From Swiss-Prot:
GO terms for cellular component: cell outer membrane. Residues 1-17 form the signal peptide. It is found in: Cell outer membrane. InterPro entries: Mlp (IPR004983). Induction: Induced when grown at 35 degrees Celsius. An outer membrane protein that may participate in pathogenesis. Some human Lyme disease patients have antibodies against this protein. The Mlp proteins probably undergo intragenic recombination, generating new alleles. Residues 40-61 have a biased composition (Basic and acidic residues). A lipid is attached at C18 (N-palmitoyl cysteine). Residues 26-61 are annotated as: Disordered. It comes from Borreliella burgdorferi (strain ATCC 35210 / DSM 4680 / CIP 102532 / B31) (Borrelia burgdorferi). This is Lipoprotein MlpH.
Amino acid sequence: MKIINILFCLFLLMLNGCNSNDNDTLKNNAQQTKSRRKRDLTQKEVTQEKPKSKEELLREKLNDDQKTQLDWLKTALTDAGEFDKFLENNEDKIKSALDHIKSELDKCNGKENGDVQKNTFKQVVQGALKGGIDGFGASNATTTCNGS
């Protein structure tokens, strides 16, 4: 019986020694796994960045008034691909068109039928831009509001 007790104690000591090494190994593996996950997440974030659209790139270069007019123009150009075609133009031409739209819409602010006239101007802009941005301006895209 003494021999069995001694062997049992030795077995427990050996088992305890193996567990302590395994615990350290498990901790190291857990830390390595965490660092791998962090590395994988940062790599996914880098690859998930989408290239910016033409509209986003243009918005970075516009002032606040021009951004507002771009939003307005986006609602005016409702046909498929019309707004995208507009964005393909030269940046300076787009900016001057947006400034012209702002100046025309400002004429309608505070007027009695301003909202109706702005909606009419939307249709005018839509028709004027069908011919391209080169002819767009005071000659073919004006509001019916009287400037004061």
